[in-house]
């Protein structure tokens, strides 16, 4: 399912996936994180606390793109957790 964001980017929600560097898809305790154009990250579940989500996003962002040291702003809007890259 695709949802349009305010910036025109898309969020993709998947039922099942494993970590894939090329597609930039990762799982976290059955919660799916999807990197779209390296700008948005979304999670279907809010079962993880703020610190864990932030750390997981940063870790996998750097894992996908090794030179990346992005800072993210996190917005929790049930049932989504959305992280936006705000700087390099």
From Swiss-Prot:
UniProt keyword Glycosyltransferase present: no
Q: Does the keyword tRNA processing apply?
A: no
Q: What are the BP-aspect GO terms?
A: defense response to fungus; killing of cells of another organism
Q: Which UniProt keywords apply?
A: Antimicrobial, Disulfide bond, Fungicide, Plant defense
Q: Which family does it belong to?
A: Belongs to the DEFL family.
Q: Give disulfide pairs as residue numbers.
A: 46-61, 54-68
Name of the protein this chain belongs to: Putative defensin-like protein 315
Question: Which superkingdom is the protein from?
Answer: Eukaryota
């Amino acid at each position: 399912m695709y949802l349009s964001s305010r910036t025109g980017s898309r969020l993709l929600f998947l039922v099942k996936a494993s970590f894939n560097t090329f597609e930039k898809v990762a799982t976290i305790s059955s919660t799916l994180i999807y990197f779209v154009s390296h700008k948005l990250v979304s999670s279907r579940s809010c079962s993880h606390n703020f610190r864990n989500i932030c750390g997981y996003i940063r870790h996998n962002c750097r894992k996908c793109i090794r030179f990346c040291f992005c800072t993210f702003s996190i917005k929790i809007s049930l049932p989504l957790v959305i992280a936006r890259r705000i700087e390099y």
